[in-house]
Amino acid sequence: KGLNTLIASGDVYIRSEKPLQDIPEVDVVCYGLWVNPSLATHHGVFVSDRKKPEVLDFMLQKPSLEELEGLSKTHLFLMDIGIWILSDRAIEVLMKRSLKEGTNDISYYDLYSDYGLALGEHPQTTDDEVNKLSVAILPLPGGEFYHFGTSRELISSTLAIQDKVRDQRRIMHRKVKPNPAIFIQNSFTQVKLSAENANLWIENSHVGEGWKLGSRQIITGVPENHWNINLPDGVCIDIVPMGDAAFVARPYGLDDVFKGDLRNDSTTYLGNSFTQWMKEREIGLEDIKGRTDDLQAAPVFPVTTSIEELGILIRWMTAEPQLKQGKELWLRAEKLSADEISAQANLERLYAQRSAFRRDNWKGLSANYEKSVFYQLDLQDAANEFVRLNLEVPAVLKEDAAPMVRIHNRMLRARILKLQGNEGCKEEQAAFQLLR
């Protein structure tokens, strides 16, 4: 009652294996997790007096290990997992602080570093209205926190979720990946991967036999191509469709943060300083027509309608700085910043490409069921996808297939037939016969 608004952070996956506790009647309820102090230093932290662990004393943003150690004698701390429940009163105060005083103009006001630091019995900042709000801190029972805020975390968090199941008796397929940290989805790949390709993510992409991959790489959005490309370790590729027929090439480094003046040696791009990147390619700031005070806003990513030229540009920007044709294409091309790419991307083309790859993937997973996760997927979702993509119903499996796999096969066939408006009872009966 009165707690009507839930705010959840968009770059985390929260998993809980136990029922939630009762929610107290306060203005702000925040969920937290007991975590290793080193992890807490990268996030917000709720600090509570050991005598009143359910009441927020104050909040810190990315505290140091020394700060946490100093507090540990008298206080407990929980890491903020980004799930807050606010009362109507708390929302009114938040909205008021988000406007310029005396106007209806939007002002910058951060939920965590502004609003959060003014909460608690001994808040870090003074704000009379926010300071008066009552706050409760709830540990998430059996909670797990997976952060997807960086490129590296995209892989590490997915790997951690994948490794939740290690019991081989619960895994139907017999395929063993060359490295557990290899993830390929909605893609067509023709390269042979090995244990050296650790921390590799390929999504919505065509990676042909002319590619040579390394480790610590994320490849997204690459259209069908015939490129010969040698991608260095730690170098990622993102191709984004623009307009009706163009693409923009956005290579980047796995740990690039996309901020900083282009003149500063501390501004990194593709794992090196941006100044060094320009020097190796014999270009200067005068060749960048636009902002150079911040990498996120600098127009350095070329646009082209030619798939062949797209590959040449990628090679020049990543591994072949002396590729003359690449430099000429880059200098002539219209170029966009990372901000402009986000604003102008043609998402319909992006999703259409993904759907085409996904359609082929469904067929491959079904045909290669012995070495894929196909029959351990959500069969309801799989049936919906087969009907949506107008795919043929999977054939009845042979008798030498594992009994449980054959049961799943029959039930999937039954569900697809029903969704198509056909009779699926015989398939259901066959599944139940296999249970006997």
Predicted regions and their residues:
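Left-handed beta-helix
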Residues: 6, 12-19, 28-38, 65-70, ...
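Residues that mark the junctions of alpha-helical repeat units in TPR/alpha-solenoid scaffolds
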Residues: 340, 399, 404-406
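TPR/TPR-like (Sel1-like) alpha-helical repeat modules
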Residues: 348, 372, 380, 429-435
